[in-house]
């Protein structure tokens, strides 16, 4: 299906091809949205939905209109509740680095106004340190750590990917090396974009949708507004 890989790519192509969705998605017990916000006008903003570890690409919007992205998230949350009769918490995991912060802020405003109930907003800042002490001994940065979560899920057949050629190409193209301290280090988004000619926006949205492995399925008593203590292990 795809050309032969280099030896230093992080996601084995055979593993990705074996993880493609071919069946209908059943009713979900757990649902997350991964939101990768475009950094530049030529990039895509992508929303990936993860229901019971079955992942779909729900919205791909070219460019960086932040308020349209907020609207897309609100509509997707509404659709999940209506289409799947979903009554549990929806976790919206956003790349909060740079422009993504504007999406996070507006969604939290809507929550404070009572217009986005049953939703927890989880910002992920990719310039921050790896949040897990044990993982920080193995992974150079939070990008490498986040991608490792998806890779581990795919290896254990705990996640199913959509049949999307561009997504698989992005996932199978990202390279890695070892830092001087022996930690796994994925190439930067900028370096990958320069090398392959596009930003791995679909891949990053899928990675974000799987970051919920580090989220407790609870909310703060008496409130559906998530805090750091309510969603991080």
How should each PLM-predicted stretch be described?
Residues 51-183, 228-233:
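Mg2+-dependent endonuclease catalytic cores in nucleic-acid-processing enzymes, primarily RNase H-like
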Residues 6, 12, 17, 60, ...:
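Acidic two-metal-ion nuclease catalytic site recognized across multiple nuclease folds
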Residues 49-51, 209:
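Residue-level signal for short segments within beta-strands and strand-turn junctions
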Residues 34-43:
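Short acidic, Gly/Ser-rich segments with clustered Asp/Glu that frequently serve as metal-coordination loops
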Residues 36, 95, 201-204:
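Acidic active-site catalytic centers that drive phospho-/nucleotidyl reactions
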Residues 24-27, 41, 86, 199:
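Short, flexible hinge/linker loops that cap or flank conserved catalytic cores
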Residues 1-35, 49:
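ATPase catalytic-site recognition across NTP-hydrolyzing enzymes
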């Amino acid at each position: 299906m795809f050309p032969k890989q280099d030896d230093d790519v992080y996601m084995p192509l055979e593993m990705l091809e074996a993880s493609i969705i071919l069946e209908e998605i059943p009713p979900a017990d757990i649902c997350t949205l991964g939101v990768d916000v475009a950094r530049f006008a030529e990039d895509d903003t992508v929303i990936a939905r993860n229901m019971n570890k079955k992942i779909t690409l729900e919205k791909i919007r070219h460019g960086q209109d932040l308020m349209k992205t907020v609207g897309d998230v609100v509509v997707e949350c509404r659709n999940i509740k209506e289409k799947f009769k979903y009554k549990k918490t929806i976790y919206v995991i956003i790349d909060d680095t740079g422009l993504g912060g504007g999406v996070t802020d507006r969604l939290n405003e809507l929550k404070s106004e009572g217009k986005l109930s049953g939703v927890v907003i989880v910002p992920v800042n990719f310039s921050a340190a790896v949040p897990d002490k044990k993982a920080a001994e193995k992974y150079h940065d939070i990008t490498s750590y986040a991608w490792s979560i998806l890779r581990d899920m795919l290896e254990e057949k705990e996640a199913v990917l959509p049949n999307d050629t561009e997504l698989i190409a992005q996932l199978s193209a990202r390279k890695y090396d070892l830092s001087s301290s022996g930690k796994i280090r994925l190439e930067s988004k900028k370096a990958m974009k320069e090398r392959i000619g596009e930003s791995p926006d679909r891949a990053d949205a899928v990675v974000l949708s799987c970051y919920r492995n580090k989220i407790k399925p609870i909310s703060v008593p008496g409130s559906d507004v998530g805090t750091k203590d309510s969603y991080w292990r």
